[in-house]
Amino acid sequence: SKETGQNWLIHYREDPAACAFASSLECEDWSQIGTATPDHVIRTKQKPLLLNPKHLNDSEKLRKEISSALEKYKNNYHKYFKTNVQSNGVDKKELDPLPRIILVAGLGLVTIGKSVKETEIAADIYQHTIGIIRKSFNIGQFSPLKDNDLFDMEYWSLEQAKLGKSKPARAQGKIVYITGAASGIGLATAKLFAENGASLFLVDLDKETLICEVEKLRKQFKTGIAFHVVDVTAEKEVKKSFEYLIKTFGGIDILISNAGNAIRGKIGEVDSATLRKSFELNFFSHQTLASQAVQLFQKQNT
């Protein structure tokens, strides 16, 4: 985000109840009333952003549609801040105006955060909130605190302290896709980025070793780590891994195309099938990965 100078992560929570709520006629009114409990405001903001995309098959129009909705949300947050600062007679520094919860008709629940942990906490909270809202209206009304009281809670220093606002790690908010990540240089690279707070998407063909190393990394580091078993010479598998990457983290910042091997043999003895296999892994796979990453960079405008 150019406005906040912060790298943001996006998390999509696959949940039929959330999808049904986001697509319902009641969502426009019910979702804008407030939080289930006052302290949720520091994790979810006071209201979610609602999206009902009209241009799903046109990426440029969809980008403009989402950008317009975000600008409207941020403007409303600025007004919320100014109104409550004036009415409460307090001197506060405005927090970032981005939503934490996005409800997308036909899709469901998307969350935004500075770390994987933040996005997952926000998703957990709002999944429960949806249930509370529905049950409340089934038996009566849902009447949370008004905006002025939520403002007091959101800007209360003791509540903000819960977020643990320490200096961000060097690579916090960065999403790094690494191939050949189960051993050697790939694993060492993963550890280095994890030490610096990056979110990792680790890829390897060796399922057992990859799972084992991911478990070790998750115990050692607090950052978000996802993995996918992929044959990088298979274009369809690479494309599926990028789809999973987007669902998990929302995008990509860095690609480390590391997977490869060195086939040895005398020039007159190495058969053509072995050479072709070597080129598939050591040349064409890197082109496939780079192509997928560049397409995503272009969509992200990064």
Spans of features found by a protein language model:
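Domain-length cofactor-binding catalytic modules of enzymes
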Residues: S1-R170
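Canonical Rossmann dinucleotide-binding motif of NAD(H)/NADP(H)-dependent dehydrogenases/reductases
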Residues: K174-F201
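Conserved glycine-rich Rossmann-like NAD(P)H-binding loop of the short-chain dehydrogenase/reductase
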Residues: A198-C212
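The beta1-alpha1 cofactor-binding region of Rossmann-like NAD(H)/NADP(H)-dependent oxidoreductases
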Residues: K207-E208, V229-K240, S272
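A glycine-rich helix->loop->beta "capping" turn
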Residues: F221-G224, Y244-L255, I263
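Substrate-binding pocket helix/loop in short-chain dehydrogenase/reductase
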Residues: K266-I267, D271-F279
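A short, exposed helix-loop element centered on a Lys and neighboring polar residues
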Residues: A290-S291
